[in-house]
């Protein structure tokens, strides 16, 4: 039996209920509230940032797959309610990486150690973008994405947004030398972990049986969310 073909056929058979698209409108009040809360987050406030991350993480778990897909589309500037496509996901990650690069350029005249930490965040975010690209290229080649893949893409998008906030937040400029060393070490670990996840995903998931596939994706969803919390707790 061709396991790879079986998995591809199985996943291509999973489609979103088109009626669920109508639920996208219900996300608008949530997003407006989240935007208002984000605007009120004080710089260098670990508690406020952690609350924001936990709130977003909880929403990513509780939201229906189509709602999650629609929110990713809205992140990409698409207000229409439809199923996420490869192009949509790639646009989200591409714009996130570009925005982070611009922020780093703006802070190029700062202390060297701070630049190194921000560069580490940038490198980690690029790897997240690569992971997200692999997700949508390998497992959403047509028009839809399985439920757990959508949740994984959302979790990656969440961590990218958190890293963007960390880079823009002036809390990095207030870290002590020891704090900078700790942050740089953590972010190097994050890069390593993400790299391992990316390699395992690409090498193993293509040939995984459905049960193993869903178990691994479920673990990765939680791992990415946990990474976001660790980054916020340690760096901010």
Curated annotation (Swiss-Prot):
UniProt-recorded name of the protein: OPEP-2 protein
Species the sequence originates in: Orgyia pseudotsugata multicapsid polyhedrosis virus
Lineage: Viruses, Viruses incertae sedis, Naldaviricetes, Lefavirales, Baculoviridae
């Amino acid at each position: 039996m061709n396991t790879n073909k079986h998995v591809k056929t199985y996943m291509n058979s999973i489609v979103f209920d088109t009626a669920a698209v109508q639920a996208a409108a219900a996300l608008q009040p949530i997003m407006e509230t989240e935007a208002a809360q984000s605007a009120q987050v004080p710089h260098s406030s670990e508690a406020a940032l952690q609350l924001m991350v936990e709130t977003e993480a909880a929403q990513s778990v509780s939201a229906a797959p189509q709602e999650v897909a629609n929110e990713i589309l809205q992140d990409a500037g698409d207000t229409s309610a439809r199923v996420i496509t490869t192009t949509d996901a790639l646009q989200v990650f591409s714009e996130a990486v570009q925005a982070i690069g611009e922020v780093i350029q703006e802070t190029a005249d700062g202390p060297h150690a701070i630049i190194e930490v921000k560069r580490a965040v940038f490198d980690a975010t690029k790897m997240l973008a690569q992971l997200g690209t692999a997700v949508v290229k390998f497992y959403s080649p047509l028009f839809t994405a399985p439920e757990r893949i959508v949740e994984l893409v959302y979790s990656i998008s969440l961590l990218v947004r958190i890293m963007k906030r960390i880079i823009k937040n002036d809390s990095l400029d207030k870290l002590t030398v020891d704090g900078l060393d700790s942050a740089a070490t953590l972010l190097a670990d994050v890069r390593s972990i993400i790299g391992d996840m990316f390699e395992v995903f690409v090498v193993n998931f293509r040939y995984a049986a459905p049960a193993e596939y869903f178990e691994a994706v479920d673990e990765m969803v939680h791992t990415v969310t946990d990474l976001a919390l660790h980054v916020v707790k340690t760096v901010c």
